[in-house]
Amino acid sequence: MQESLEPEAGIGEELIEPKAEESRVPGSGRNIYDILYGNIGKKASYPALIYYGRRVTYFQLISAVDSFAAELESRFKIKKGDRIAISLPNSPQFIISFFAIVKIGAVMVPLNTGQNAANFVKKLEILHIKGIVTHSQGYTLLKDAVTEGMFVIVTRVQDFMPFEKASRITFFDSTWGKVKWGGNVYPFSDFMFGSEGSGNPVNPDDDVAIIQLTGVSLPNLQAVSLTHSNIISALRQASDVFTITGKRSIVACATPFSVPYAYLFGFLLPMGAGHPVLVFHDNHDSKTIAKLCRKTGADIMVAHPRIYSKLLFNKKTSKHLKKISIYISGTDTMSGSLASAIVDNLKGKLLQIYGFSETSGISHYRWVDDSGQPANTIGFPFKETSCKIIDQTTGEEVKVGEKGELLVNGPQSARKYLFTLIGEEDNFAGAWFHTGNIVMRNQEGSYILIEKLRDIIISDAIPVFPNEIEAVINKFPEVSESAVIGISDGNLGESIKAFVVTKDGTASCQRKLIKYLNENLAEYQRPHFYEFRNELPKSMSGKIIKRILIEQAAGRTEENTASVK
């Protein structure tokens, strides 16, 4: 990158110490951009981002955001309500694009980076995307998808890294040279030195800031519209539960910024208090994550169970996390042994967040001070969040200790789906969001998750629909039928397991099937385990009974199961 964004201090050097203060959450009548801009005064010279040793100050970050926003308006005539997609790994470029888009009243659409080309192309069409910010590796997915009038801004993961680190990555990365520049394709660096611009005033209660996908791939594409007010309300409630008070706290985020939990706790909450965020472009590289946490002195971590498992159950990585005092976990419940590794072994504080994309990523929380608590406890509703549990048959509220469907209502909740699956239009009934989760409430007012009714697997923080995977498996010539379920994979959270019935009744096609699925499924959709069977359990009507498969998978040794590493 250009010289103006060179770091002020190298990795391991002293940070300028900001004064401890509570998070500055803007009022409900404000733009999300105000969360960042509040640091332009006293904290302009403090680090906002740390990216593999490079420090970007709040002044530099705000300048980059303002420039990017002004260029979007002047070059592409972006106006309020236009939709711009971000398909990037965690990086400074993601955060710059995020704030620039919402500043001018446009709509940010986060898209997962690990998907196949056909899925990506169709998604851009359905969402009516005006432009997209992506990286050079992702450019190959959409080079043939760009329609007339759609612009593409391309960056590299190594931009914003220190020169030596960036040079090593560039040496092995050939994707930048394959980008066809010109026309409507532009390098990200061209947008860093424009004018400041003015932004557009927003009506926070009505103007959409983010279109959040709740079903991320075809044919199960779902989305909700989250307003500026929804996000700021979620942030306000989050800050009631957790306030960063340390003078030089550094928040490390190892969950994709494309999910609400991650952008809420991973950078909006820290930046609301003027603290730096430690960013990793590869959230699966646990060795590098751990070492950077140690070198920078990060003391707060935002991640999800699968990442925590990789970090904490490996002595080579866990030894680097001794300075982490607070662990925040979201997107799924955490196993008892994983909670014990944090609370008992590392003596850290553990905050578990539970929520839905439809509720801006939050509905419940719990501070885990006893690793012996049931692992499926999701905790208490946030301060401004109302919950009730109803009998699915009568619709009446159930008594304490009885099971029923969880309904959620709060200022962070979306009003309706932008588009959705047939049969789920009524999930927003009146002011209440029907979660599809069966829960119970104990005498203390804490909620316990019993069962998820919706056929969705949360794999590595991303919602996955089993029927999408089954459709691809069943197209393989040697397969007769299949069933895909989510299984508890120890401390890793949910893993994807495929039960396959072949036409010849054997597993001889296993290698070819896995190769076929790797070519036709997005990375996050690929099964972790396979089990080949002669038949699948079915009802009298011939419908596969997945409940039996789930029970069998939970209670058996995996003697007939192939694991894919």
Language-model regions: role of each:
Residues 115, 122-123, 132-136, 410, ...:
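AMP-binding/adenylate-forming catalytic core of the ANL superfamily
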Residues 155, 521-544, 562-565:
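AMP-binding/adenylate-forming catalytic domain of the ANL superfamily
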Residues 176-213, 220, 243-250:
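Conserved pre-ATP/AMP-binding loop-to-beta segment of ANL
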Residues 57-59, 200-201, 209-236:
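Conserved AMP-binding A3 loop
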Residues 380-384, 396-426, 462-464:
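Conserved ATP/PPi-binding loop(s) of AMP-dependent carboxylate-activating enzymes
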Residues 232-250, 258-300:
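Conserved AMP-binding/adenylation subdomain of ANL enzymes
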Residues 176, 298-303, 312-373, 386:
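Gly/Ser/Thr-rich phosphate-binding loop
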Residues 28, 45-79, 85, 89-91, ...:
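Conserved AMP-binding/adenylate-forming core of the ANL superfamily
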